[in-house]
Every structure is written in C-alpha cells, then in structure tokens.
Amino acid sequence: MNRIFKIACLILAIFLAPQLQAQVKKQPVKKPLISAKKPIKKVVKKPAVKSAKPVTDTVAKEEFTKVKISTNEGDIVIKLYNKTPQHRDNFIKLVKEHFYDSLLFHRVISQFMIQGGDPKSKTSAAGEMLGMGDVGYTIPAEFDSSLYHKKGALCAARTENPEKASSGCQFYIVQGRNISEGELNNIEQQSGIKYSSAKRMTYKMKGGTPFLDMNYTVFGEVESGMEVVNSIAAVPVDNFKRPIKDIRMRMEIILPTEEKTDSKK
C-alpha cells in the first residue's frame, strides 16, 4: 500500500512540475516589465526638463578674462579660454606685472600670424633679430580638440621640444588664410586629426592655420580688433620678418565693469 501511494505521489509531482515551473517564469518576467515602464517614464521625463535649464545657465554664466592689447595700429581685445588654465593664468600674471608693456610684435608674416612677447624687444636695436628671449620657464602643453588655429586664435609660441611645452611669454595671433577642402583632407591624413563639418567650414570660409593644430597650444581668441591684426600683418618687414617700423604693445586686463561701460558707449 505504501509503495502504491509513493508511486501515485511521484506521478502527481511529475504532472504538476511543468505547471509550477511555468508560473515561476511568468511572474518575474511579467511584473518587472510592467513595473519598469512607469519609473523609466518618470525619470526620463522630469530630469530632462530640469537638466535643460542648468546646462543653459552654465553656458550663459561662463565668464572669460579679457585683455586689451593697445598698439600704434589700434586696439585688439582678446578672450582667454578657461580650458587652458595654466596658459590663461600665466598670461594674466604677466599682464598684471606689465611684462608686455613696450614689447614689440617682432615677427610678422602676412596670411600666417603676428608674434610678440620677446622681452629683449623692449631695448633692441633697429634691425636686430629677435625671438630668442624668454622668462626662464615653460608651460606644459594644454591641447584641446575644440580649440584650434582659426583666424584670430591666440596661441603660445615655443621652441622645438618633444613635450611641445610652450614659451613662458611669447605668443602669436593667427591671421591665416582660407583653406581648401583638399588641404584639410591632406592635413587629416598626415596628422590623424579629424575635422568636423563646423571646423571645416570655419577654415574654408574664415581661414586659419590648421597645420599647427595639436602642435601649439591655443589659449584664447580675438574678440574685437581683427582689423588691427590684419593691418599689422600687412606692414613692411625685413629679412627676419621684423616690421621695419616698430609696433609696440601695451596690455591691460578688462574688468567686467569696464566692459559694460564700453558696451553702452
């Protein structure tokens, strides 16, 4: 009798096992799918609205230090990038110390750039070759793919060195020229840099010097006074590319209050 009862229980267990297994499978699959949909909708919906404002506010509120470069050809206002803090802070330090006052734009090449910041240029004789003066230290390269050598870019000069470290004081402002699609393709192949459609359009329509990208640190740009850069780039130069007539500079930090006052004039 016991044997018959055991056999009957075994048969019943075999018959019920698939049904129990099916119920176990159905419940976890069914419930999580239903419960997952509602939270996802709420999480996606609300943060999307909330996060949109802070992102816009952050961009709108980002402040840049600006410097006015006064020359006998006119004034140039440059904006220093926050993405290159070491170059920015060093430049601000030198401006506040009046390091650049009375120095020359000592190297000028039309459709390329205008260069200055050699401390020896303050007392140099006419016709003397310049460009070797410095402050005794370099700044580590700060490359960022979003910062490139478009027309008006403010960049750090440097000597040949494997780290591509920048001069502590010498800089150049890009004048450049319009770059063709073919030239950009060649630069991409040679350097491995990939240019977005926006960058390509900038180089083709406004110009620049793309062959210097990711080789020299770009740490600012001309905000106003590009016509002054063009004027300096067009002056007669000697065999050293030094302007025949000295073009001296004087720099000062533009405070936010001064900027607002100037905009009202």
PLM feature spans:
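Bacterial N-terminal signal peptides
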Residues: 8-17
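Cyclophilin-like peptidyl-prolyl cis-trans isomerases
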Residues: 20-265
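Bacterial N-terminal signal peptides that target proteins for export
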Residues: 1-9
